[in-house]
Design a protein with these regions (language model features):
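Active-site-proximal, structured, solvent-exposed surfaces of multi-pass membrane proteins
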Residues: 185, 688-794
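Membrane-embedded helix bundles of polyisoprenyl
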Residues: 14-20, 98-116, 120-175, 179-218, ...
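Periplasmic/ER-lumenal interhelical loops and adjacent helix-loop junctions
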Residues: 230-315, 338-347, 351-356, 360, ...
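Aromatic/acidic, Gly/Pro-rich catalytic loop(s) in extracytoplasmic/lumenal soluble domains
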Residues: 617-679
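Contiguous transmembrane helix-bundle modules in multi-pass membrane proteins
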Residues: 128, 152-155, 159, 171-175, ...
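Extracytoplasmic/lumenal acceptor-recognition loop(s) of multi-pass membrane glycoenzymes
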Residues: 51-53, 58, 70-73, 475-496, ...
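Aromatic-rich transmembrane-lumenal/periplasmic boundary elements in polytopic membrane proteins
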Residues: 18-61, 240-279, 529
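Active-site lumenal/periplasmic loops and adjacent helix-entry segments of GT-C-fold
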Residues: 19-162, 290-294, 564, 568-569
Length: 794
């Protein structure tokens, strides 16, 4: 009963805050799975649940990029992602998903903070600070970084790492054999859970945990037995990593991704002290202030509070907290040094690990130490004289000045974080009254409880009880205040769904049903209004489609591209994601874009309408603002924005004779480099149903495939066809050496037309094709893809 009484204030605080968070989520629906990355993350999970196989690290579908590998953020061990598969309406699923993510984060932060040595009160305050400042819906109040609105799966990774760090720190601390075995097993299970939920992002999330955990362990000077148990836990993870083939999985993905930087590491500069000094002196680090110590950015003040708290912990504490505080200060400092090299472009392929990931990795520790200076008595900051000697006046003055400076800095931090909520809102008398009434209610409740407990003799000091109550009430009260001024958000509604409905009926894919062709969205932008945005953007020409989303959403209530189509299972040629392939970019930029077009590696897009090329890659429908298409395209409908007379109508055209796996070339032209292949495709583009360009010599044939059916299946496709002899089918899917015929059918897969798949067979075939790349697989296939790219000159 006494334990429940002690826990009750904490439970009430969390219950009230959780209820207000859910209310906020209902009023701020666009804070959950925010466009564009958040929408994409949600679609990615839902598509994997529908088209993927459990625990497949290379989930494959024809929904985007002509059979591209999904970004491997997998739902199978991620409860927040699995919630998106619940039979609820769309908004309810999002709320449940985020509620699960928030619960994971809160529990794991408390667990890690307690394992380091923080009190229950400070651990709870740290968890509530994290959830309130950085997690939807109240993250919109502060706009520090919309990370969890865009990439909510990171919450699961953070929770797994928090719990894993706590298990690792506890492992071997006692001689209890069952306990140590259980902790080693928990550490391995959490490692596997994080790794299999998001293989790449998980690795990016680990640096702070590695550095700070190592500092804590070294600071303890543990006995050999503890070292042995910790080494065993780490060894188990290494055995799983290397034994499951994950090393070649990472190397293969890096070798084929368009996102991998191609510039070499600038070792001459990295190893030069003079180059570093010049960089520190002349490079404006705060040109990208996000998450760095740049005071014009609101998030910098959270970092400042954490650094002050870490310094306070070093002076006033001993043990793990002191070691963790020192490690956090060193880590943030080194992260800023890394930021200089990252922004200067010195890191080459290692630049895929951006500075933002390094800071995001230590957010849990930042929030733990950010609460320290607010709850640590300032008197403990005063310097202690040795022995019983009295402190000199200088030391007294130094302690007083230090206390005042810390207090002023904390006030500035609070003001800077709380001012201008939601960017353009203001606090008024109503918010002041809400805060005062809520605080008064807390004080009244405390006095009432103390009076009741006083009768039974079980009562804490008034100061302790009131302090605990105020700390636990801070964030629920702030939530009440911020909800009172939160702007209401309305989700855009589609004004005329005729085009998307037509595509859903005639082009959507389902497991076990035939493939019916891709859709491509191509903006001509006749008046130069669709892609209006900053000129010096890394998006380059892809800004036409990036800014086009908002342009069409404001006028039509839909974007006519990407997740708006993928959510309806409408497959597209274009792709948005981190791992769009080098070969697909090479094809699109050389054959479906004007000369000199430059785009961002995350965007696979079409910039020119070439019906012959588009047919060959399987495009059947084109959404465009162009008025007409040549070569007999049939108009299937159009929509207009009545309230925007200058906005172009969006039209839907259907191309005749698209390649639905129905192109059966009989003649083959050999070409060895990408430029040569592109030239041969251009020369023969009017007969790509008869001619294919290959790198390996293939003899001509007279037999053509007939009765071809290409069926969508989980993690792959099935092709059935017949012929009168040796024949070939040009499949509208990206080629990879990882495509495997898994049912023993006599079919051979090779590369054609730079990045398409050519299937060769004799007389009859029923081939089940899967993309095999992941756990316990021969992942060297992806490395061979990378070697192909080099041989092609990509």
């Amino acid at each position: 009963m006494a334990a429940f009484a002690r826990a009750l204030p904490y439970l009430l605080s969390w219950a009230v805050l959780a209820g207000l968070v859910i209310v906020g989520m209902k009023g701020q629906p666009l804070a959950l799975y925010t466009p564009v990355d958040g929408e994409w993350a949600k679609w990615n999970v839902e598509a994997i649940l529908e088209f993927g196989k459990p625990f497949d690290l290379s989930p494959y579908s024809m929904l985007a990029g002509m059979g591209s590998m999904y970004f491997p953020n997998l739902p199978w061990l991620n409860p927040g992602a699995l919630a998106l598969g619940l039979p609820l309406d769309d908004r309810a699923k999002s709320i449940v998903s985020y509620a699960v993510y928030a619960a994971e984060l809160a529990v794991s932060i408390i667990l890690l903070a307690r394992s380091i040595g923080f009190s229950w009160l400070m651990a709870t305050a740290a968890a509530q600070l994290y959830v309130y400042l950085l997690f939807p819906p109240f993250a919109a109040v502060f706009r520090i970084y919309d990370w969890y609105s865009l990439a909510p799966y990171f919450a699961h990774l953070t929770a797994a790492l928090n719990a894993a760090a706590a298990a690792f720190l506890a492992c071997g601390r006692t001689r209890d054999l069952p306990r140590n075995i259980m902790l080693c097993g928990a550490f391995l299970a959490l490692f596997v859970s994080g790794l299999l939920s998001a293989p790449f992002t998980f690795v990016f999330a680990t640096p702070a945990y590695i550095a700070i955990s190592a500092a804590i362990v070294v600071g303890r000077r543990p006995p050999r037995g503890e070292w042995a148990w910790k080494a065993a836990a780490l060894l188990l993870c290494l055995v799983f990593f290397f034994g499951s083939g994950l090393l070649s999985y990472y190397l293969g993905t890096i070798a084929t991704s368009g996102r991998t930087p191609t510039s070499p590491v600038a070792w001459d500069k990295i190893l030069s002290l003079r180059a570093w000094l010049q960089l520190f002196a002349h490079h404006p680090l705060c040109q990208d202030p996000r998450l760095l110590l740049c005071i014009q950015d609101r998030g910098a003040w959270l970092n400042i509070a954490a650094l002050v708290g870490a310094a306070v912990a070093i002076v006033t504490r001993r043990g793990d907290i002191r070691s963790a505080g020192a490690a956090l200060i060193a880590y943030i400092g080194l992260a800023h040094v890394y930021a200089y090299a990252y922004q200067a472009g010195w890191l080459g392929p290692a630049g895929v690990l951006s500075t933002h990931f390094l800071i995001l990795s230590c957010w849990s520790f930042i929030c733990m130490f950010a609460v320290v200076p607010f709850f640590e008595p300032l008197s403990r900051l005063q310097l202690k004289a040795p022995g019983a000697a009295k402190r000199s006046q200088i030391k007294q003055l130094a302690g007083f000045v230090l206390s005042i400076a810390v207090a002023a800095l904390l006030v500035a931090t609070v003001v800077r974080l709380l001012r201008n909520p939601y960017d353009n809102s203001r606090y008024g008398p109503a918010q002041l009254m809400i805060g005062l009434v809520a605080l008064g209610a807390v004080v009244l409740a405390v006095e009432t409880v103390r009076a009741y407990r006083g009768k039974t003799g079980a009562v804490l000091s008034r100061e302790t009880t009131l302090r605990q109550a105020i700390v636990l009430a801070i964030f629920p009260i702030l939530a009440l205040v911020h909800l009172s001024i939160a702007p209401r958000q309305n989700v855009p509604t589609v004004r005329d769904a005729s085009l998307r409905n037509y595509l859903h009926e005639n082009a959507s894919i389902e497991v076990g049903r035939p493939f019916r062709g891709y859709t491509a969205t191509i903006w001509v932008d006749k008046y130069g209004e669709i892609g209006v945005g900053p000129r010096d953007t890394p998006l380059r020409d892809a800004k036409l489609y990036y800014y086009g989303r908002d342009y069409f959403s404001a006028r039509y209530g839909e974007t006519f591209t990407e997740t708006d189509l993928w959510d309806l299972n409408i497959p597209t040629f274009e792709e948005y994601g981190e791992w769009t392939s080098v070969q697909a970019h090479a094809f699109a930029l050389r054959l479906l874009a004007p000369s000199g077009t430059a785009t961002h590696s995350n965007y696979l897009r079409v910039f020119t309408i070439d019906p012959d090329i588009l047919r060959a890659v399987g495009v059947r429908y084109i959404l465009t603002d162009a008025e007409t298409l040549d070569q007999g395209a049939v108009a299937r409908g159009s929509v207009s924005a009545a309230n925007f007379p200058r906005s172009p109508p969006v039209r839907l055209f259907e191309l005749s004779n698209p390649n639905l796996g129905t192109y059966s070339p009989t003649q083959f032209i050999k070409a060895m480099t990408a430029d040569e292949i592109v030239q041969r495709i251009r020369e023969n583009k009017h007969r790509l149903d008869e001619v294919a360009v290959v790198s390996d010599g293939l003899p001509s044939t007279t037999a053509k495939a007939r009765n071809v059916v290409m069926i969508v299946e989980r993690d792959g496709l099935r092709v059935r066809a017949a012929s009168d002899g040796p024949a070939h089918i040009l499949l509208p899917v990206q080629f990879s050496h990882c495509l495997v015929v898994v049912n023993g059918a006599a079919a051979r897969l090779t590369r054609a037309n730079l990045f398409q798949t050519l299937m060769s067979f004799d007389r009859a075939v029923d081939a089940r094709i899967e993309f095999r790349f992941g756990l316990f697989a021969d992942n060297s296939c992806r490395l061979r893809d990378g070697l192909d790219n080099k041989a092609l000159g990509l």
